[in-house]
From Swiss-Prot:
The gene is TNR. Glycans are attached at N179, N197, N277, N391, N469, N580, N734, N790, N872, N1031, N1041, N1256, N1342. Neural extracellular matrix (ECM) protein involved in interactions with different cells and matrix components. Involved in cell attachment and neurite formation. Interaction with CNTN1 enhances the neurite outgrowth. It comes from Gallus gallus. Residues 187-198, 234-260, 265-291, 292-323 form the EGF-like domain. This is Tenascin-R.
Length: 1353
């Protein structure tokens, strides 16, 4: 190494290295120092010390030496993870290596030394002591070696005048072909060198031990070659006909062998032959240049083409060698009836004909054949037996050679039952009859399915039965009756017809709380769905017709009002649906008699009371009058006949004067009697009777009388002279005579006597008396008419015993006499002749002495016309009629006057008996008088009052007509109108009174779709106009309250309230948002319909109107939106329920969602949250459950009645996941259930073993006893009992030894363990009438609950 002045660069390197050694001495650890020298070009350095872009010639490029010293921790050190390679970039301050860099450069030199020493910032202690100084010195020697090499390079050619000088103090170790390892103290040679000092050239891979290395080159053995003798040599060098690869020859096309010297066959004869000098000799069955073709058998018999060893036969031939006639292909059944089979096949063009052979599949059937031409491909075999399985074979024929047959087995249909008809129909029964079959079969199945598909009845009958009476049907229900013939597993096409049972009417009708005008009716409603209850009642004799009320169906009672008292009524209550009316429930009742009303006293006397009352409305024939004194004495009862007028009178006689009586009057009709109408009344005090003047003097008058019968205090006698000064005297009640004295002589006295009791006074008895003697002096005539006269006279004194009145016409000698009582003071003469003079005389008789007669004369007046009457009255005229008078006269005078107007009169001849009055005013009251006239004398006036007729209103019309209203309008008459009378007629008339100022009237509460006749006339007082009329028909009222409910994905239930009027049907139209529209005709009796087949998540608008003939009502409408489907292919009823199918019924599920495994099941969507698959039901015993293994495996029965779903289906369903089991049992109103939280049935290999979980419920646990048991039937005994449990207990079950429950036992059998038993509920001696077994997914309740909550959110 040179001096410091000579080589400052080296000096700097040594300084740095010494620092490194010092650090190593101060902090010893076991490390490994690696020094790497990297020669590189140095960029030029500018004057300021920066780098310049200078590119000297190649030989003069500067040299840069980078020395990197990495002091590394050994690999096995625990701290090695903290160190990084020298070449890595350090990314963070904490993990960076401690780096010391020094750069030494000479501006005059083109050599730069860079020293970078990397020390780990953190290092663990080395496990050994400080490295030996020898190793460090070796590093220094290496450094000086590199410096010596640098001197050699930097000669005058590259460094020019700045060439470095120095001396070589160190020889190169490892000959410059390797590195010296301080660890092993030996050379590690570079590739291609070897030896202790790496001075010996080395052969590649040591010639692979297959040759000798000479001066670095391999001399290979004979069979090998290549640079390293690793390649195999090929035989003969492949003879220039191939390529040597890994010692094997890849020969050119057409040559082969190890050395490619042999000719080669095409494709090596495909492995189906051997190559002979380039030519293939093929094995048997192959041919071709390369033996690639297959030979065909028998050269395809000349009837085909050989391809790939297979014969492609000509039409009509087949087989491996085309030697056989080909059978028809694709034989199929295209039609089956009860007597024929239609077959089709693919025709072969070469066939000359086909032979069709068929015979019954059962034993003993004869074989029949038919031949058809070869161009046929269909045939219909006829005249077959219904319900028979036939084996059918078809042969193709070519040149009398038959092909092998193609066969099929076909069963003809059973014939459709014929002649289905209904013999008798009641509310709950239908008797059906049909025609028998002439061929053997197993039996009949008849079903009665209601229109709403809820319930239904199915019965199986022997083949000999052709009539059937089905009982227990619902009244008023439409049923589809279907009759099907059965044979083996076949069913005939159904014969069906619809029939409706009669609607049942109300029953147990009861009439109670009957009074005179009210009766209360109760009944039991009908079971059938009806539109209305008709209540009809009327009088038993038919008077007044019948009144009908149309009541709403829920009503079961009604109060009849405004009845006629005492009348017998007939009552009928029936049900109505559409035009069908049930048989009525009949009753009769009689209203009570109403009591007489307005009881009053018309007149009273001391011994009588005259009673008057208004008659009862009832046709009472008499009245029972009961009366007695208030003290209860003198009780009397009398029966009084009913008067013909509105009132009846009765006089109670022989009463005690001055006494108060209690009176009760009841109406009596037959055996009925009304409640009494009561009152109190008092008789008058009776007067003294027979008051007589017994004697008379100049100053006194003696009187006598008969005493009053009633209790009195005294008598009061009043006497009054003509001068008018009255006097009175009181007489004891015990006296009956009195003499009045000190009277004025020759004076007339008026004497009266009354009886008194307290303030009550009797009527007075009066008599006129005269002191001294006074005869009758004059007759007085008054009220003279053409036929009568009144005569009065004064009292004689003393009083006469009797009076004799004599009268006669003047010119007649035969007078007439009247004998009168001496007390009489007047008389009336009647029946006299008109215009005749009469002589009248009166004689008073005293004992045997008669007074002188007192005489007078009169002349009667003219008689008036008789029988005056009016006829032919019009608005402005009328005719009066009369009969002529008796007395002669000159003419008639007729006068008439309006109520407010002048009087007109006219004279007509005496021979007239009628007269026409004209030019009168309409609706005017006229007073008409007719009298006869003779000279100046006129008769009395015969008069009559009448009215001219009113003019009628005009142009009555009905406008603004609706279903329940119409407006009547008219033009009024000319005269004033007090009121209009409208008579509105449908079936019966209704009278309406309208004020006369109106010219229109609004009719309301009309019946829709009804024709009305309106007649009207005007009235004014007693006057009425002519009647005018019009007709109109109300519009059809629409249904109301259209509602959509039970909306699911594909259906919705529409319901409505029917219109009031009669209709023919409904027109229902529904339209979706996409514009599609459908119209349905719905029967009139329906009030709901379920729309099916709707689109999911679609809004529908529904419009409904009623129709009657060509009439249409208005529309009502509603909208609804169908739901979406959660499960595209539901695998159980729970998924159907979550799809929105909420109605219980028959659904289709897909096992595991696979559409190819569809099963029809009955879903219970209501019990305990719904979603149950019902797999067994017992309810009426119509289905036989004592069946074989095959039946229980596949299932049987009617899903809507009694059935068993089938063990295979139950296994498949329960294999979908965890299911729970519920068993519902009912006995009348009593119910119980059992619940098991796990349920599964094994497959057929396990004999359908039962697996159930924990029990819960109300019935007790009777099923756990059967846990793990296989299923047993009468023909598969899998129980552990000595006997066959299924045979012993007439069922099929998971029997053990034998059972605690037997839900498939015999229906209705109560013998021990023989029926449908559940031991822990009803024991073994009770057959449960209703059982349902059902299953659903165990987590359904949670899932459905989450679904509902999500929908709410």
């Amino acid at each position: 190494m040179g001096t410091d002045s000579e080589n400052p660069v080296l000096r700097n390197v040594l300084i740095s290295f010494n620092l490194l050694l010092l650090g190593a001495v101060l902090k010893p650890f076991e490390c490994r120092l690696e020094v790497t020298t990297e020669p590189a070009e140095r960029p030029a350095v500018d004057e300021e010390g920066g780098l310049a872009n200078c590119s000297p010639p190649v030989k003069e490029q500067p040299m840069v030496f980078h020395h990197i010293y990495n002091i590394n921790v050994p690999v096995d050190s625990c701290c090695s993870s903290m160190l990084r390679s020298s070449a890595e970039e350090v990314s963070s301050e904490d993990d960076r290596l401690a780096e010391y860099t020094e750069q030494t450069s000479d501006s005059e030199s083109q050599v730069t030394f860079t020293h970078r020493i990397n020390l780990p910032k953190q290092a663990c202690k080395c496990s050994t002591s400080l490295p030996s100084l020898q190793e460090l010195l070796s590093r220094i020697e290496m450094l000086e070696r590199e410096v010596s090499m640098l001197r050699d390079q930097c000669n005058s050619n590259c460094c020019q005048e700045n060439a470095a000088t120095g001396r070589l103090d160190y020889t190169l170790p490892c000959s410059g072909h390797g590195n010296f390892s301080l660890e092993s103290c030996r050379c590690i040679c570079s590739e291609g060198w070897a030896g202790s000092n790496c001075s010996e050239p080395r052969c590649p891979r040591g010639c692979s031990s297959r040759g000798v290395c000479l001066e670095g080159q391999c001399v290979c053995d004979n069979d090998y070659g290549g640079e390293d003798c690793s390649q195999l040599r090929c035989p003969a060098g492949c003879g220039s006909r191939g390529l040597c690869v890994d010692g094997e020859c890849i020969c050119e096309e057409g040559f082969g062998g190890e050395d490619c010297s042999q000719p080669r066959c095409p494709r090596d004869c495909s492995g189906r032959g051997h190559c002979d000098n380039g030519t293939c000799v093929c094995a048997e069955g192959y041919a071709g240049e390369d033996c690639g073709w297959l030979r065909c058998p028998n050269a395809c018999s000349g009837r085909g083409v050989c391809q790939d060893g297979l014969c492609i036969c000509e039409d009509g031939y087949g087989g491996q060698d085309c030697s056989a006639v080909a059978p028809p292909e694709n034989l199929r059944v295209t039609g089956i009836s009860d007597g024929s089979i239609e077959l089709a096949w693919d025709s072969l063009g070469a066939a000359t004909e086909y032979v069709v052979s068929y015979q019954p599949a059962g034993p003993g059937g004869s074989q029949l054949q038919q031949r058809v031409p070869g161009d046929w491909s269909t045939i219909t075999i006829t005249e077959l037996e219904p319900g028979v399985a036939y084996n059918v074979s078809i042969y193709a024929v070519i040149s009398d050679v038959l092909s092998s047959p193609v066969t099929t087995k076909v069963t003809t249909n059973l014939a459709t039952p014929q002649g289905l008809k209904f013999k008798t129909i009641t509310e709950t029964t239908v008797e059906v009859q049909w025609e028998p079959f002439s061929f053997p079969f197993d039996g009949w199945e008849i079903s009665f399915i209601p229109k709403n598909n809820e319930g239904g009845v199915i019965a199986q009958l022997p083949s000999t039965v052709t009539t059937f009476n089905q009982t227990g049907l619902k009244p008023g229900e439409e049923y589809t009756v279907t009759v099907v013939a059965l044979k083996d597993q076949a069913r005939s096409p159904p014969a069906s017809d619809s029939i409706s049972t009669l609607i049942d009417g109300p029953t147990q009708i009861l009439v109670r709380d009957v009074s005179d005008t009210v009766a209360f009716v109760e009944w039991t409603p009908p079971r059938a769905r009806v539109d209305a209850i008709l209540l009809k009642y009327g009088l038993a004799d038919g008077e007044g017709g019948r009144t009908t009320f149309r009541l709403q169906p829920p009503l079961s009672q009604y109060s009849l009002q405004a009845l006629r008292p005492g009348a017998r009524y007939h009552l009928a209550v029936s049900a109505l649906r559409g035009a069908n009316e049930s048989q009525p429930a009949l009753a009769q009742f009689t209203t009570e008699i109403d009591a007489p009303k307005n009881l009053r006293v018309g007149s009273r006397t001391p011994a009588s009371l005259e009673l008057t009352w208004d008659n009862s409305e009832a046709e009472a024939h008499s009245y029972r009058v009961v009366y007695s004194t208030l003290a209860g004495e003198h009780y009397h009862e009398v029966l009084v006949p009913r008067d013909t007028g509105p009132t009846t009178r009765a006089t109670l006689a022989d009463l005690v004067p001055g006494t108060e009586y209690g009176i009760g009057i009841s109406a009596v009709m037959d055996s009925q009697q009304s409640v009494p109408a009561t009152m109190n009344a008092r008789t008058e005090l009776d007067s003294p009777r027979d008051l007589l003047v017994t004697a008379s003097t100049e100053t006194s008058i003696s009187l006598s009388w008969t005493k009053a019968m009633g209790p009195i205090d005294h008598y009061r006698v009043t006497f009054t002279p003509a001068s008018g000064m009255a006097s009175e005297v009181t007489v004891s009640r015990n006296e009956s005579q009195l003499t009045l004295s000190e009277l004025e002589p020759g004076t007339e006295y008026t004497i009266s006597i009354i009886a008194e009791r307290g303030r009550q006074q009797s009527l007075e008895a009066t008599v006129d008396a005269f002191t001294g003697v006074r005869p009758i002096t004059q007759l007085h005539f008054s009220q003279l008419t053409s036929s009568s006269v009144n005569i009065t006279w004064s009292d004689p004194s003393p009083p006469a015993d009797r009076l004799v009145l004599t009268y006669s016409p003047r010119d007649e000698e035969a007078p007439q006499q009247l004998a009168l009582d001496g007390t009489r003071r007047h008389a009336s003469l009647t029946g006299l002749r008109p215009s005749t003079e009469y002589l009248v005389s009166l004689v008073a008789v005293h004992g045997a002495v008669s007074s002188e007669p007192v005489t007078g004369s009169i002349t009667t007046g003219m008689d008036a016309p008789k029988d005056l009457r009016v006829g032919n009255i019009t608005q402005d005229s009328m005719v009066i009629y009369w009969s002529p008078p008796v007395a002669p006269f000159d003419h008639y005078r007729i006068s008439y006057r309006a109520a407010e107007g002048r009087t007109d009169s006219t004279a007509i001849g005496n021979d007239a008996t009628e007269y026409i009055m004209r030019l009168l005013q309409p609706a005017t009251k006229y007073e008409i008088g007719v009298k006869s006239v003779r000279g100046r004398e006129e008769s009395e006036v015969a008069s009559i009052t009448t009215y001219t007729a009113m003019d009628a209103p005009l142009g009555v019309t009905a406008t603004n007509i609706t279903p329940t209203e119409a407006l009547l309008q008219w033009n009024p008459p000319l005269m004033d109108v007090e009121s209009y009378v409208l008579v509105l007629t449908r079936h019966t008339g209704e009278t309406i009174l309208v004020d006369g100022i109106n010219q229109e009237y609004q009719l309301t509460n009309l019946q829709p779709s009804t024709t009305y006749t309106v007649a009207m006339y005007a009235t004014n007082g007693p006057l009425t106009s002519q009647t005018i009329s019009t007709n109109f028909t109300t519009l059809l009222d629409p249904p109301t309250n259209l509602t959509a409910s039970e909306v699911t994905r594909r259906s919705a239930l529409l319901s409505w309230v029917p219109p009031v009027g009669d209709i023919e049907n409904y027109i229902l139209t529904y339209r979706s948002t996409d514009g599609s529209r459908k119209e349905l005709i719905v029967d009139a009796e329906d009030t709901w319909i379920r729309l099916e087949g709707l689109s999911e998540t679609t809004q529908y608008t529904v419009r409904l109107q009623a129709a009657q003939n060509a009439m249409r009502s208005g529309f009502i409408s509603t909208t609804f939106t169908t739901g979406g489907r959660v499960f595209a292919n539901p695998q159980d009823c729970a998924q159907h329920l979550m799809n929105g199918d909420t109605l219980s019924g028959v659904y289709t599920i897909s096992i595991n969602g696979d559409l190819s495994q569809r099963v029809q099941v009955f879903c219970d969507m209501s019990t305990d949250g719904g979603g149950w698959i019902v797999f067994q039901r017992r309810q009426n015993g119509l289905t036989d459950f004592f069946r074989k293994w095959a039946d229980y495996r596949v299932g049987f029965g009617n899903l809507e009645d009694e059935f068993w779903l089938g063990l295979d289906n139950i296994h498949k369903i329960t294999s979908q996941g965890r299911y729970e089991l519920r068993i519902d049992m009912r006995d009348g109103q009593e119910a119980a259930y059992a619940y098991y939280d796990k349920f599964s049935v094994g497959d057929s290999r396990s004999l359908y073993k039962l697996r159930i979980g924990d029990y819960n419920g109300t019935s007790g646990d009777s099923l756990t006893y059967h846990q793990g048991r296989p299923f047993s039937t009468k023909d598969r005994d899998n129980d552990v009992a000595v006997t066959n449990c299924a045979m012993s207990y007439k069922g099929a079950w998971w029997y053990k030894n034998c059972h605690r429950t037997n839900l498939n036992g015999k229906y209705g059998e109560s013998r021990h363990s023989q029926g449908i038993n559940w031991y822990h509920w009803k024991g073994h001696e009770f057959s449960i009438p209703f059982v349902e077994m059902k299953m659903r997914p165990y987590n359904h309740r949670n899932i459905s609950g989450r679904k509902r909550r999500s929908l709410q959110l």
